[in-house]
Amino acid sequence: MSKRHSPAPADDRPSVVQLVPDEARLYNLLMEPGETSLSPEQLREHFRRSGILADDPRAAGIYDYLDKARQRNETSLSVTEFAVVFAMNPSLFMRIAEDSMVVPAWSDFARSVGKIFNERRSSNGGKVAAYIPELARVPADRYGLSMCSVDGQRAHYGDAQEMFSIQSISKTISYCIALEEAGNERLHERIGREPSGHSFNAITLDPRRRPHNPMINAGAIVSCSLIRPGDSASARFSHVFDTWKKLAANGAVSFNNTVFLSERDSADRNFALAYFLRENGAFSKETNVAATLDFYFQCCSIEMNCDSMAVVAATLANGGVNPLTNERVFSSGTVKHCLSLMHSCGMYDFSGEFAFLIGVPAKSGVGGGIMVVVPEKLGFCVWSPPLDENGNSVRGIEFCKGLTSMYSFHNFDIVTGHDGSERIDPTRRNVSLDNARHVDLCWAAMHGDIKEMQRLVASGVNLNGADYDGRTALHIAASEGKLESVRYILQNGGQFDRVDRWGNSAVQDAERGEHHAIVALFEAFASGGRKTRLSA
């Protein structure tokens, strides 16, 4: 199985650690009631219950440290030792301790989803895809599920680590890559945006002689033709493969050459479709049809497991930013277009029914996988090879129905309000949790953690929110002398003239602390610098 992180150094225990109040407060918060110390196993359990797994790159050093503590037979962590671990990812610790992830009660949610998954295991019917000989060899009893939140909380069930052929799920990412490289106008001159009303491999075009959409074979072949058309075959595929690796946070992604050869040898329909496309001017004049088809078959022959595919889905749910690496892979506009097409066209001839019943973007493949995206919340991948008459996983569809019967994930659940149903929003927040997120923002400002501030603001935290004393994140950053925090807040709409309940502004806090560079920054902003980027 692919490792998402490298091991930490052999000894990561510094001899001196500077303690700050946060460590002591969180140490006490994480201790079990009645205990006088925090054990390495208790800390590991806090991470596990929050959905932060051992192969999460954000927690790599933390788990390595706890493993070494286990090997040393340590039964407790001192506050000083805890500070070492805390310093590896302070913002992650804060959010785990205060249960402020997007799904607050993750362990309860994961247990409930596991029950839905197991109840659908007995769903019978369907047949494993036989028109690609290599796929026909996959055992019909395989069944796996993984989920990943936009905060990187993860859980796996069944055969979630077993590799499967992604097939048509590849169309989503090929479309995203082509869209970013060719641009919206150029790409959609050649590919439409409408459901076709025909089967996924139908030899048909829209009235403008284009494939109806990028989620059917014709559209995906044209998408592939627009990806780095001037590069060599190996360079083009490496580019797509590397993009999948980024989306999966360097998780399990591979290429199955046997599936590729099997698919190419049984691809008469796709060859006919490609030459039909060329006859109707769907390709540029320079396009090599045979090479484009090989490229398309290669993309379909990528293999992943549910674990990695769920991270891909969560990256799309997170607007193109990978929740495990914080790397932006696609622009938010690209993701918006992709999710729109997944919602209307992603499930073959069942797309309309899926949109009506389930109500979230999804893409299936004849390998038995379904990638499901709940925007701003979660990504799922469910895999089971037996397919229904539409080419969708039988157990996968049943799982999705069970999921949305329990949870309010349908895109339009928001308009029903309190309609008497007992469906649950697992991300629902209360006032105390919103207050905790404001505390997170102030903490990040105090420590100069710009990435954490960006994440919190992107998730909806008010940059100008104040505590009961009227103090904002800008007050805190100015008091602590955090120049870059102040700069970020001012550049993003921070109100520099807000006063706390004692009548103090942030600039007065900076003056009192003799933080002269920050005072100068405030002066530049007040005298017209708000129109500039306030660069250092």
Model-derived segments and spans:
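Structured C-terminal helix/loop/strand segments within mature extracytoplasmic catalytic/sensor domains
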Residues: 10-17, 43, 318-447
